[in-house]
Amino acid sequence: MVLAHGGGVTTIKLACLDLAGTTIGDIAMVERAFAEAIATQGIVPGTGAYARAMVHVHRSRGCPTIEVFRGIFPDNEAQAQAANLTFERSYEGAIGRAGLTPPPGTVEALEKLRAADVKICLTTGFSRTTLSRVLTALSWSDKVDLALCPEDAGRGRPMPDMVLAAVLRLGIEDVRQVAVVGDSESDMLSGRRSGASVVAGVLTGVHSKERLLKGGATHILDSLADLPRLVLGGDRLESPVGASAL
């Protein structure tokens, strides 16, 4: 449970883990839900507006879904809210039809962390309603200590509020005892801004290694399955050169 950091030793006591693309392999589901949502507002496939909207969606992954739609419909709050509602219904419907599947090794990683007394907080840009649906589908009540969405903390990513809320709620004494893991640039920004010692980008989701490093990743992992090896000891994973502190 110790990680060399800045010449000293930090004990990791909390892992804040992103949901979509990190702990659950639902990237295609999420993309389809975004596409359906903007189509209901008149932005349809095959148009330049659709292409621009989906580029915005990709760049904004990890941020609160309502904020993604506000970026697409900046002058029409009602339209953004309507699109967000369609997104939630589409995504939740997909969960009901197909279920959710974590990437290989994810469940085992959670179990190893919990066995080592590392607390687990799941974080997301989804609404509380959608988060509750995801948690029900996963049946992970015995594997996580807390699950937060933006409305639980104040602001969503790339702000650090969810990480800091988890620190307070779970009684962590020092933000340096936190590891933040995600698949998007906004996850990395949030982790760095929170002061977490470990901000690890995983390659199972939406953004490339380069984007994750741009966001300030301290480590790059193939998947969440590698996290116990990083924070619990054993083989050391080197920090990537060039990770920016933001």
Language model features with spans:
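Non-catalytic pre-domain segments flanking phosphatase-related domains
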Residues: 1-17, 239-246
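Structural recognition of alpha->loop->beta junctions
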Residues: 139-149, 211-229
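Conserved Lys-Pro-Asp/Glu-containing loop-to-beta segment of HAD-superfamily phosphomonoesterases
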Residues: 157-188
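N-terminal helical cap/lid subdomain that shapes the substrate entry/recognition surface
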Residues: 10-116
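Substrate-recognition/cap helix-loop segment adjacent to the acidic, metal-dependent catalytic center
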Residues: 39-41, 69-74, 99, 107-121, ...
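Short acidic capping loops at alpha-helix termini that bridge into adjacent secondary structure
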Residues: 46-49, 142-146, 174-179, 198
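Acidic, Mg2+-coordinating phosphoryl-transfer loop and its flanking beta/alpha structural elements
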Residues: 179-219
